[in-house]
Amino acid sequence: MQEVHQTPMMKQYFSIKADYPDAFLFYRLGDFYELFFEDAQIVAKELELTLTSKNGKQAEHPIPMCGVPHHSAAIYIEQLIEKGFNVAICEQTEDPKATKGLVKREVIQVITPGTYMASLSEKENRYLVAISDVAGRFGIARGDVTTGESWLTTLSSEEAVLREIEGLLPNEVIVEDERLADLLRQTGIPLSIQVDKRESTLAQGAKDEAQRSAFELLFAYLTKTQKRSLDHLQPAVAYEVEQHMQLDANTARNLELFRSARSGERKGSLLSLLDETTTAMGGRLLKRWLEQPLYTEQGIRERQDAVENLVDDFMLRDQLQEELKRVYDIERLVAKVGYGTANARDLVQLRDTLERMPSVRSLLQTVKADRLQQIEQNLDSFETLSEQLRAALVDSPPISTKEGGMIRHGYSDELDELLEAKANGKSWIANLEQQERIATGIKSLKVGYNRVFGYYLEVTKANAKLLEEGRYERKQTLTNAERYITPELKEKEALILGAEEKSCTLEYDLFVALREEVKTYTKPLQQLARSLSELDVLLALAVVAEKREYVRPVTTSHVQIERGRHPVIETVLPRGEYVANDLTLDDTRQMLLITGPNMSGKSTYMRQFALIAILHQIGSFVPAEAAELPLFDRIFTRIGAADDLVSGQSTFMVEMTETRQAVTEATSNSLILLDEIGRGTSTYDGMALAQAIVEYIASSIGAKTLFSTHYHELTVLEDSIPSLENVHVRAIERDGRVVFLHEVHPGRADKSYGIHVAELAELPDSLIDRARTILSELESEATKPALNEQSAPPQVEEVSQLSLFESNDAVREQLLKLDLLAMNPIEAMQALYELQQTAKKG
């Protein structure tokens, strides 16, 4: 920062700024927030503001400066927060009119991406995550300051931490050191480094020291930045990753759980399909259920019972949803009360919500499902609080809490007297206007008011000469009018303004006292919010089940899906046009090798199964005529091809990295979906890798797997791997054109119909004709090498190798030295890569 002549104000600025080097300091000067030096230069550029100079551009050391009006600062602050910056709000803590010299100032709040309370997406959480490394175990504390919720878990590796953060996509992450910061910078999420911690009884639910340390880091950060009561924070809830089906960011993206892959929007995702919730807090809970499907049969069954109860009783379902449509976001209303930012409209929304509770509870009297009965028991009507809010607040109060108009007549005798005095004074002034018009004969005479001159009598210049000398005292001359006052008018003005100021002050004091009273109900109101959120989600799942004709799945040890459907794709097709398919997997049939033409629906079939499995484990009904499913601990997917441009990884490297995750972390209780593995490299490399991966999964993991491939040669593996079965997606030729039937049948596909797909894409006719000629020549030559049919799982002692390199002795020598039985698929990939490089040099 440049050297400048330090006035008392600038000394104050430097002193405050030194404590907040990582935030833009919004320094209050009168009606503006001003920024100086580098803060001003960056903010002016980011927000396209005019950059000026505090001491004039001609000064020897001009001070860069920009500013925003305090009444519209929220707009600018939001833009900076969304860009990942922090903002420190520095307010005047003394009345400038009552202070001689420099006004005291202090930072009242630091707003960060993870603590921003305003302009929130209703159905999205705003997560702030703290990570603490305790002896190689990583505690994760995830909090949402806008609702007061927080969760704790422990992870065992940096890779697991990175996956967790990529899956959560929090708004901000706090770490203790540069090592973790370096690990997480690749995510692009705003990071803060902090070493201070603060103990809290809210961390009593922590399962280990790593979780406790992470929460204390989170709590210290909130205390330091928010500088206010955090009474709305709820006790942290610890969970084990193993309690839920694990879905990493890659799987969520491939299955389009939360965003459409095509548009990046919520529309077109599974979440969008399921979201029939009517409250914001229900929408947030639904997303969390989808992020963490259950891995306990009892929890799933309890939810299914509740959904079934609501599916069977459509009148109850409809009536409950109608009631919930009039329920506001209690979680965030309570948070605003705890923060001290709730206004009268917020409390009216809370009151209106509480007044719906007797009806909701009455409707739930007849339910049979245990979860619904528990919800009914947790619904307190808060009659005392509701009546107090009804008595205190008008139905449509203003947003501002300092300009009156909030408190209902009859709540405070003192306030009523002040308001009556103000009303009487204004009535006197209204009468004065009529009286003076008659007395002067000037019909255009009027009484006006502004904040500078107060009340005045205004007469046009043309009529001013009609006034008696000395009748009024001239106060202000305008271009076309004269403004006057009288002693009596000023006396009434003092009475009116005095009553108005006192009434506004009293209203504010009454409102603050009321808000503090509401704060004492924080914990039971948060329990009410949790119950209503769960009811809302269960209703939403019931609505979808009834509307889409879903069935209740049965939890078993095997997979048996009859006429299953893709939940999202079927909704964009005309009713009845989606082609449903069966799927069976059990202990003897654990893997399906899927072949079929491009565009025939192989990937859709795979995604369909995964989505049905997820729906089962969130407690939902599923799109099928019947379904029996096991509990999956995790779903791994490699579907689609995409380069990772940020880290410089090719399509093939991304493919292998994701495959490595599956083959090294999957268990026999996992579900693996691998689509067209090996297409990112040469034909023989890809084919060899695909076969090795299939064999490894079958022999070493035993996970239920769907493996689609364009290598038709792999279908011979059915003969040597007992747990593998071939299926194909059927297509037929009709009048020289391919017709995709989207039906999955046993056995292998005999053709890929690639040229037909090219025709559908409307490639030039000459190109298509040439492709047919080349294909005919290749097929007649029959030069395609076949996979060795003796390839087998581990019980086979020797595996013959393909003769891929006929003329390169060096490559052949390296190839013969490879011990394939001791290699995993990733090691095989590396070996093949080295062989390929050697062959290129030869």
Swiss-Prot record:
Annotated ATP binding sites: 596-603
Superkingdom assignment: Bacteria
Keywords carried by this UniProt record: ATP-binding, DNA damage, DNA repair, DNA-binding, Nucleotide-binding
One Pfam family recorded for the sequence: MutS_V
A Gene Ontology BP annotation from the UniProt entry: mismatch repair
Single GO molecular function: ATP-dependent DNA damage sensor activity
Cited SUPFAM superfamilies: DNA repair protein MutS, domain I, DNA repair protein MutS, domain II, DNA repair protein MutS, domain III, P-loop containing nucleoside triphosphate hydrolases
GO cellular component: cytosol
Cited function: This protein is involved in the repair of mismatches in DNA. It is possible that it carries out the mismatch recognition step. This protein has a weak ATPase activity.
PANTHER family: DNA MISMATCH REPAIR PROTEIN MSH1, MITOCHONDRIAL (PTHR11361:SF34), DNA MISMATCH REPAIR PROTEIN MUTS FAMILY MEMBER (PTHR11361)
HAMAP family assigned to the protein according to its UniProt record, in alphabetical order: MutS
UniProt similarity note: Belongs to the DNA mismatch repair MutS family.
The protein's name: DNA mismatch repair protein MutS
Lineage, uppermost ranks: Bacteria, Bacillati, Bacillota, Bacilli, Bacillales
